[in-house]
Amino acid sequence: MGRRSFGFLYRSRDFLSKTPRERGRPSPAKLLKEFEVGDKVVIDVEPSIRRGMPHRRYQGKVGVVMGRRGEAYLVDIKLGGKTKHLIVLPVHLKKHSG
């Protein structure tokens, strides 16, 4: 028996699947969303775009936009008493409503 793989997409089968109605690429508006520094955002991974995708442990977490890195945003998230800095494309973010 070989050793079990624990890669980046480990245990993400349901998390990275879409319903038939949601299948396909996202709209251009979703790809080009804009956020301001200081905005609260929720990490909501878009499975059809792997580029700029955060790890699944951050799915559903709320963070604050701290700046830009090219097309992506620098997002700070509190996790386990520490602040994590993520570089995430806007297609994987949505505004926090709370």
Swiss-Prot record:
The keyword Ribosomal protein applies. GO terms for cellular component: cytosolic large ribosomal subunit. One of its GO terms (biological process) is translation. The keyword Glycoprotein does not apply. One of its GO terms (molecular function) is structural constituent of ribosome. It holds the Pfam family Ribosomal_L21e. Keywords: Ribonucleoprotein, Ribosomal protein. It comes from the Archaea. NCBIfam families: PRK04306.1. HAMAP family: Ribosomal_eL21. Belongs to the eukaryotic ribosomal protein eL21 family. This is Large ribosomal subunit protein eL21. It comes from Korarchaeum cryptofilum (strain OPF8). The gene is rpl21e.
